[in-house]
A protein has these predicted regions:
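Iron-sulfur cluster-binding electron-transfer modules in prokaryotic oxidoreductases
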Residues: 2-292
Length: 292
């Protein structure tokens, strides 16, 4: 009887999972929340065995072939699993999709069959109607009264020739998800503006300008927080806001959430006091009305 009950509770869907370097380092909370959401949805994540760095900016700015080869190795591992490949990191997603485009466009690239691997960003995974319905049914702590703006950044939807996005300039996936959680989505025009993540170390001055524009636009829209699904964007937006606040005490300060963090918090049975500890900007005041 116990075995039968266990069998009924076992996840019925399995997907390959490529966390990438950031989610094993500075964005561990993103990784943890993706795994929490997968459990809520009865999805088993099978982390790729012996995966490697996608190369991100350092590889494709150095050597095209190196960038393709690094991504290709991960695609080969995924191809052996014969499962869809779920990718949370926007940069990793971009590099895997760019490698697949190279296989299609460049006959000399040795990537037979790798362009057919289904590479799915978490935002596309969670926007499916059936997935949104399951999340809606699992919400225990709705974000009623909370005003948020979705921030997609540069890499999840653009360029569409690489990502395959049908709405590269005005994506809707996170908008739908935020509403399912009970929050209000505020209209704004900075959804896909660059935050300067790749310049955050060599040109912090430019990055601060870009971040300031984004945060001020969110504040003007009436938002109490920004929601993203890119580890570089999240770290950059929060850390540079602290710099800006030191320069100008009147500069707005908005917490930046991973969308999966909010899903995990809203569907959790109990309040986890340490959930927001990794954040540089404390979201406690914003989330307290929802009991989070």
């Amino acid at each position: 009887m116990a075995n039968e009950e266990k069998k009924e509770k076992d996840p019925t869907v399995e997907v390959a999972y490529y966390p990438g370097c950031s989610l094993h380092g500075t964005a561990r909370e993103y990784d943890g929340s993706v795994r929490e959401v997968a459990r809520v949805l009865d999805v088993r994540l099978l982390e790729l065995r012996d995966w490697n760095c996608c190369g991100a900016s350092s590889a494709h700015m150095t050597d095209h072939r190196l960038a393709v080869d690094l991504a290709a190795r991960n695609l080969r591992i995924a191809a052996r699993e014969r499962k869809d490949l779920l990718v949370p990191c926007a940069a990793c997603f971009q590099r895997l999709k760019a490698a697949q485009k190279a296989f299609r466009d460049e006959p000399d690239q040795p990537g037979e069959g790798l362009a057919e691997v289904q590479v799915i960003h978490v935002s596309d995974w969670l926007r499916k109607p059936e997935t949104l319905a399951r999340i809606r049914g699992a919400v225990k702590h709705p974000l009623k009264g909370l005003r948020l703006v979705p921030y997609y950044g540069c890499l999840i939807t653009r360029p569409p020739a690489v990502t395959g996005s049908r709405e590269p300039e005005d994506p809707k996936g996170m908008d739908l998800l935020i509403r399912v959680l009970g929050a209000e989505v505020r209209r704004w025009s900075f959804k896909t503006e660059c935050c300067g993540g790749s310049l955050t170390m060599p040109r912090a001055d430019l990055t601060r300008i870009l971040v300031s524009r984004i945060v001020k636009a969110a504040a003007r829209a009436g938002a109490q927080g920004i929601v993203t699904m890119c580890p570089m964007c999240q770290a950059n937006l929060e850390s540079r806001q602290l710099d800006l606040k030191k320069q100008d005490r009147e500069h707005p300060l908005l917490p930046v959430f991973f969308a999966t963090e909010l899903v995990a918090a809203c569907t959790s049975e109990t309040r986890q006091v340490n959930r927001w500890k990794p954040h540089l900007i404390d979201p406690a005041e914003v989330l307290s009305p929802a009991g989070l």
